[in-house]
Amino acid sequence: MPSERRSPDELDCDYMNQLHNDLRVLRAVVDEELRRRWDRSLPFADALFDRWERADQLGFGEGSSVYDSAHVFGSVAVGEETWIGPFVILDGSGAALTIGNYCDVSAGVHIFTHDTALRCVSMGQAAARRSPVSIGDGTYVG
């Protein structure tokens, strides 16, 4: 039987402190292994979770990967062997966003299928513009 959900005020401080300590130890172990094997240090979630598994869960093409820190919204399709870097935003909430095969979307890139600049500068008189975005095969974005 699942435990009853408690408010943050009701959480056991000893339990939370132990959990925090356990996570710190895990973070140190993961970071040490990354540095040893690949000479890199990543944000905890990016280091902890598998990029290829996440891409598969999102329905991206075979062999593609997406960092845990990347944000994916709306209708986004990604082809095979495509790399989506850390801190990327793929926002297909305005229309479809399609990225081809063998592409690299570099760290921090933001791709949107909508534009709200006219809505803002017109003080709401103009609507946001929405349009599909398609990035072809073999493209580097960065």
Model-derived regions, located:
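Flexible, glycine/small-residue-enriched loop-and-beta-strand segment within the central core
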Residues: S41-D50, L58, A70-V78, W83-G142
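Terminal amphipathic alpha-helical/low-complexity segments used for targeting or macromolecular assembly
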Residues: M1-Q57, G61-G63, Y102, T116-L118, ...
